[in-house]
């Protein structure tokens, strides 16, 4: 499920940065951190696959469908 992928998927895991806000990553459970970010799941999956800022590109390292599950989990924590 999305939470498991978020916590223990491809390294570095989503949780390794988004739990603490490392390198400016918006934190889960903190809706204010996501202000100004396009919250469209597909747009966030694209950013994850391509890499953005300090976040490395996951294209070729992670399955797009699993990335989408993790993104949807993250979005569910800020609704």
UniProtKB/Swiss-Prot annotation:
GO terms for molecular function: electron transfer activity; heme binding; iron ion binding. The keyword Iron applies. It comes from Halorhodospira halochloris. Signal peptide: none annotated. Heme c binds at residues 14, 17-18, 55. Keywords: Electron transport, Heme, Iron, Metal-binding, Transport. It comes from the Bacteria. The lineage of its organism: Bacteria, Pseudomonadati, Pseudomonadota, Gammaproteobacteria, Chromatiales. Residues 1-35 are annotated as: Disordered. Binds 1 heme c group covalently per subunit. Residues 1-14 have a biased composition (Polar residues). The keyword Cell cycle does not apply. This is Cytochrome c-551.
């Amino acid at each position: 499920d999305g939470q498991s992928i978020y916590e223990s998927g491809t390294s570095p895991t989503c949780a390794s940065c988004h739990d603490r806000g490392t390198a400016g990553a918006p934190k889960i459970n903190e809706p204010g951190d996501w202000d100004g970010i396009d919250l469209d799941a597909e747009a966030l999956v694209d950013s994850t696959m391509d890499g953005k800022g300090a976040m490395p590109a996951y294209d070729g390292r992670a399955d797009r469908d699993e990335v989408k599950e993790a993104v949807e989990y993250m979005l569910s924590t800020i609704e």
